[in-house]
């Protein structure tokens, strides 16, 4: 469900946008359309003064910097893909396999021995894909979450993101940032009837099945590993980004063990920390809205959604 953000946390002084449910621009008081917590965050003593809001220009500049800092991404010879059929708008929903060959012709699996890749892959078998099935989190799985977070925070890319967010008064310490990432991404919430059956990480990276359709599932590593096992059948693509190096972006149609994904977009060839960092940035800066970025001189938008039915900490939302 799309819900515009209903808080001024981190939004003070941002320009008026009709997309928003409530507003945080300087004139909202006289226009009587401020968010309820406007005074708390944006008043003289508020946490989010206008200098702490994240501007559109800063998002463009920081995303370019994170793109440059993705030292663990695939090199040109590391991956060969075979996109085959380009589906038109009238074809994406008809569940026809128009590509006889797999999407991935070759992946240099030495990539997967890099610490952030290895710790990421360990997380992928921790989930029940069906929504409505309670997730049982073992002590080992909690250790795997902590290990992944430690590894990504060792990268220059995630350090750059942390320093930026700390400068915007979002976090006072790296430990606070790490703890919030853990809750935001791995905290469980219910997509069904009260069972704690989902998390941001499971939805975005591992994928879920809801009402007979694939939901989420935006990660190239997960796609490659399942395709290699014969559990995923690539059908077609409806978008191929303008990038001629990795990461690239594809819009995909595929079947996962008989369940269909009509349009699934994915970065191809980026490191786990790049995706994790970029999505975290967008969720913190533009929750529930399009987050406009620039990668290698090409524009792209990422849409994140806050889970509005439950929260953690003092009203923070899961991704």
Predicted features, each with a name:
Residues 12, 24-25, 181, 278, ...:
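Generic structural hydrophobic/aromatic packing signal, biased to beta-strands
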Residues 300-319:
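Extended hydrophobic
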Residues 2-44:
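Secreted, short cysteine-rich peptides and small extracellular cysteine-rich domains stabilized by multiple disulfide
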Residues 16, 294-301:
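Short linear interaction motifs
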Residues 26-30, 173, 270, 310-313:
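Generic detector of ordered secondary-structure context
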Residues 1, 26, 44-53, 316:
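Polar low-complexity intrinsically disordered regions
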Residues 45-296:
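N-terminal "domain-start" segment
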